[in-house]
């Protein structure tokens, strides 16, 4: 039962997603730009994550760049998008924004290791994983290091 006098507020991010669902890209683009102007940073963060997940990288990137001051961890997302676009230097630049004092530093080191490995710099990738292990004993880091050691012939 609906309460009288209360309107359900649909934000522009939701309208954009509805337009995408209806395959109306023109309308989705209009709502996207309205969302950038009117929706909260939290709502935009959710929208960007969703858009990144479905491959709308330019839109996700634009949102992340607008909210990076409030949510510095989106530098990880920006780095991933840059890497997907083949802009490895740009990806590294985003990762450099994440300092050792950040809760996201280990993730940044792991992503750097991935990027170095993709660039064929396996020794540097290994160094980044070893550095990450100084901050965390996450089993994925241990596995990644074992994988690199195997690739390097370090048994």
What are the functions of these language-model segments?
Residues 21, 53-54, 84-85, 118-119, ...:
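Register position in tetratricopeptide repeats
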Residues 10, 42, 73-76, 107, ...:
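Start-of-helix register in tetratricopeptide repeats
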Residues 38-40, 69-72, 103, 136-137:
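Short coil turns that delineate tetratricopeptide repeat
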């Amino acid at each position: 039962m609906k309460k009288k006098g209360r309107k359900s507020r649909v934000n522009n991010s939701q309208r954009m997603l509805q337009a995408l669902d209806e395959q109306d890209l023109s309308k989705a683009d209009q709502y996207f730009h309205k969302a950038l102007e009117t929706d909260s940073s939290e709502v935009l963060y959710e929208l960007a994550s969703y858009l990144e997940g479905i491959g709308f990288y330019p839109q996700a990137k634009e949102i992340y760049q607008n909210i990076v001051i409030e949510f510095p961890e989106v530098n990880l997302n920006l780095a991933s998008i840059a890497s997907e676009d083949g802009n490895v230097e740009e990806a590294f630049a985003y990762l450099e924004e994440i300092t050792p004092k950040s809760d996201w530093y280990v993730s940044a080191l792991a992503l750097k290791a991935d990027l170095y490995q993709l660039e064929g710099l396996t020794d540097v990738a290994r160094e980044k994983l070893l550095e990450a292990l100084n901050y965390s004993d996450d089993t994925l880091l241990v596995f990644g290091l074992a994988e690199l050691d195997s690739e390097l012939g370090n048994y």
